[in-house]
C-alpha cells in the first residue's frame, strides 16, 4: 500500500464530497487531488528527488493535509516538525534528516533567519501561510498555480514514508523511520476494530498534525473516505463550537484536552450529540476525568490507544465495549495488527499479573532510528520493539501500563525524557547536581519536577530555572516544579535513586 491510496479511492467513488474544511475553505476530494498533483509537480521542479526529505513546520491546516499527500506523490519522504521545539531542536532535525525543503506557515516564518543560519544546506523554503511571503521564500499557492500536475509516484510498500522525530535521552531527538507499509498496517488494523475512523465520518483535527497519533487518525479517516475538519490548534471553546456547527463525529484528544473540555463552563450549552467517537491516548488519564468525560459526551464511545512513534503508533486498543466493562485503567488488548508481550530483563515472558517490559512485534514496527544504528540495535531485538515501558497483562490479555522504565515523562501528551531536561538544568551556574522525575498532575497528566542541589551560597528561583531551561529545550520540557535538596539519593554504583525521589512524593 501507499499513503495516497485512500485519496485515489475517494476520487473514484466520491470526487465531489468535501474532504477538508479549514476556516472558510472547503475542498472536495477531487479538488484536493488536483492541488496535490500540482504541489508534487512543483516539488519535482525544485529538484526534489526520490527519497529526499521534505519538512513542514506549521500549525494544523488543510495545507498540512496536502503536504502529507504531495510529498509521497512526488516520491519524497515526510519530515513533520514538532511545533513546540526550540530553534536548536528544529535545526537539529533538519540537519540530521538532511531535509533540503521546508514548508513553513505564518506562525513560524519569523524563525526562518535563525533556521537558515543553523541549517546552511536548507535549499528551499515554501511559505504555506496566508500572510505575505517572507524574503527568500516561495509562495505555496503560487507554486500550485504555476506547476503542471504530475502522476503519482505510487511510492509505497517498504519504501520510507517518513522520518518522525521523537524525544531522545541524549538531549536531541531520534528520527523514527516508518515505511508506507508500517503506517498502512497500523491504520488498517486500527480501523478494523471499528474504533478509529468509519465510513462517512467527520473527523476533527485539533491535536497537532505533526504528531503521529493525529496522523494515524487522519490516515484511517482517509482510507475510509471520511472528511476532515481542521483547527490550527486546541482552544476549548472553538473545539466545542466546531463539533456543534460541523456535526463532527470523531475526534482524537490527549487527556489534558479532555479535562479542559469537561471543565469548560459552557460545555453543556453546545449540542454535542453528533460526536460518536472520542479516541484518547499519549499520556496518563485519571479515572475520575474519564468518567466525567463519558458523562459530558453521552453519545460518544470512548477508545484508548496505546503505543509510540516507533509502532506507527498503535499497539493496543481499549475499545468502547471495554470501557463499559470497568477496565478504565487498562490500555486495552493487542490491536489486530500487533503482538504484545511482557518480559523480564532477559527477554523471557513473565506470568500474567507480573510487571515487566512491554515489547511489541508486527508489520507496524519501525525500520529503525535514522542515523542511529546503536540505538536501533538496542530497541529492536529478535524482531521485537522494546518499548522501555513497564506493565503487565491480565488473564484476558488486557495490558496495564504502570511505569516508564526509561524515565520518560508524559506531560500534556508530549514525551519528555528526564536526561534531556537534566542536561539543560545542569548547565545553570547555580546547579551542582540535579535529577528530574515526573509527578502526577491534575492538568497535565504528569509534570516535570526537578530536584536540585545548589552550589554553596547559590540561590535559584523556579522562574529563573524555567527561563534558563527554555533557552536550551522546548518550553513544555521545562520543570513546572522544583525542590532544593541538600543531596540526592545515590546508589552504590553512583546512580541517582529516582525511585527514592518518587517514593517521597508518593508517601506525602
Task: Name the predicted role of every residue range.
Residues 33-39, 145, 176-198, 206, ...:
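Conserved structural elements of the adenylate-forming
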Residues 184-202, 210-250, 264:
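Conserved AMP-binding/adenylation subdomain of ANL enzymes
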Residues 15-16, 146-165, 172, 196-202:
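Conserved pre-ATP/AMP-binding loop-to-beta segment of ANL
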Residues 223, 248-252, 264-326, 339:
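Gly/Ser/Thr-rich phosphate-binding loop
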Residues 85, 91-92, 102-106, 243, ...:
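AMP-binding/adenylate-forming catalytic core of the ANL superfamily
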Residues 8, 18-61, 65-69, 86-91, ...:
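Conserved AMP-binding/adenylate-forming core of the ANL superfamily
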Residues 52-53, 59-79, 83-87, 92-101, ...:
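A short helix-loop-beta submotif of the ANL/AMP-binding
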